[in-house]
Amino acid sequence: FSNTGFALIYNDDLYKKKIVSKKLENRDLLIFQKNLKKGTKVRITNVLNKKTVIAKVGSNSKYPLFNNSVVSIRISKELELDIDEPYVEIVEILNNSMFVAKKAKTFDEEKNVANKAPIDSISVNDLNAKKNKKKKISKTANFNYIIKIADFYFIDSAKSMIQKIKKETSLNKNKILLKKISNTQYRVILGPFLNKKSLQKAFNDINILNFENIEIIKNAKNS
């Protein structure tokens, strides 16, 4: 399993407001992810800066459809996530993976150091305050995403999916596109979206069709 999308950075207000149904501790190396079983090991990558951590999936928790996961404050700090653009890739790691063995060992060593450092006082705003000041000017210009619905082997299958989306949703028809990846791969996408609000609305609208693994993908500048 793999998925790219926007994580939700946990804080207690989300639990109090019932946006998420379970708690995460600040120090946890846990995430909530609805497609994966509790205890599954995952590699989480901040796609924007390529920083990576290994974590485990926690208990089943409700959280907004738009988000592909809920991550602890500790994970967000390790990845240096941008609160306005917490774009991550989540990859399930198989138990027999050599990568897991290496990373788990390294992370255990890091954990001994990290556990000694106070983290309870860190807020989501604190994590990104300095970075936001530097990036404020260019952030809007760099926000450009598409929603990947599915890949198809046959172009007719992809076209049928587009017709289904047009018929059964209220999405802007000009945003529903067919992209040829190769001679045997045709991708149905929505977009592009140049701000988070429009991206989130389209993502929530398409979810009435109950697709299993919709992904949000950073759009290449000239695509």
Mark where each language-model region is.
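Secreted/periplasmic proteins
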Residues: F1-I146, Y153, S157, I216-A220
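Extracytoplasmic
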Residues: K139-F143, Y153-S223
